[in-house]
């Protein structure tokens, strides 16, 4: 387990059926999901999955319907019991926790936000937000203060005394987000939270969550079937197919180097210039003019800057710009109009 790892999953399996453990013990691991189902009558929903999530990052699990993404994420809190494997949070194995410790994890350290909001229709917005604090036994005044603070954080000032039926879908999802944040969890799990929303509201909620994450710096695990949403939201993305992870990487790594045709199919319609960075696209061999600019500390571009932010600066000039490592400041290459235009047309 690395120092900054918050969640580490190792060799997670989930088999659905009456004899799941026996079936897994005797399973030919080379069989496909359909072959296992045909031979045993059991369904392999998650197959030997391993990944880690760093503290404070947004880790996206992306896949089509039936890929196993929701089952996998429910294994993190044992809403679904893994058939085999380890789930460690802060080096504690969740699969070995007592019921008491598991309740503490779900109540105090982890919150979930679902596609269907799950709000109590008979409770006002402020009461819905404070529900998690209520079951913790937090005093009413403290509960109200924290709920109002979180209400304001998600942009619902003035809606505290309304009922869920009086709110739009996007506003109801904000209440669900506020309820999850109010208990100040270490980990937030989102199961396709925006997929039922209209496209415009969905984009607004994505932007809102990104903004909130910059402030609260929680560890987030976000499930989606939408690759565009995955690359927008995720620091790292795990792409699933048939219960297995096809590829894990940053959005840039996946767009630039898809490991197979399945992953490549997702990336083909993505505007690559919005994902790729100057460091990824830079020409490694620099001309003398570029080296001179670097020596002068003039007009250097950091390696982590996205290409789309450079278009206005570079598109109308023949000038070559030094690209420097965002951490060390060392010269790593150069970038010019031809590179920017290539990234826009590839």
Give the residues covered by each predicted segment.
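A short, proline-enriched helix->beta-strand linker immediately N-terminal to the Walker B motif
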Residues: 182-186
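Helix-to-loop junction immediately C-terminal to a conserved catalytic motif
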Residues: 77
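Conserved ABC ATPase signature
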Residues: 163-167, 171
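Conserved ABC transporter NBD signature motif
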Residues: 85-93
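The conserved cystathionine-beta-synthase
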Residues: 290-319, 323-327, 333-346
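Conserved ABC ATPase "signature" C-loop
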Residues: 242-243
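Conserved ABC ATPase "signature" region
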Residues: 25-35, 92-93, 134-137, 141-158
